Amino acid sequence: MPRVKRGVTARARHKKVLALSKGFRGRRGNVFRIAKQAVMKAGQYAYRDRRAKKRVFRRLWIARINAAARELGLTYSQFANGLKKAAIEIDRKMLADIAVHDKAAFSSIVDQVKAKLAA
């Protein structure tokens, strides 16, 4: 078998890894063997946190809705129950946005919820 010279592919692979580790601190950004491990770990963190991000944002939206609802005399669980009874199908992301940016609209939603809870 003929000899295989891999200078071009090895350099390309090293350049790719070092490009991905650009901005890392110390030798993690400029030594291939260490950068390769750092890039792998960064990929693991990125994969994990893309999934965690969904949970984190849901918790944030619930906290914002809860705070806004409590200002108007309801807890989050009462508010969520009232939304279901009033057949208001707005997701948590939109409710949190309304609660933060449009107090009047959120107040009218809470009034509808209170009416359904009282009935």
UniProtKB/Swiss-Prot annotation:
Spell out the disulfide connections.
Answer: none
Annotated keywords:
Ribonucleoprotein, Ribosomal protein, RNA-binding, rRNA-binding
Record's keyword annotation contains rRNA-binding: yes
Gene Ontology cellular-component annotations: ribonucleoprotein complex; ribosome
Kindly give the HAMAP family that the UniProt entry links to this protein: Ribosomal_bL20
Family of the protein in this entry: Belongs to the bacterial ribosomal protein bL20 family.
Q: What is this protein called?
A: Large ribosomal subunit protein bL20
Q: Give the gene symbol.
A: rplT
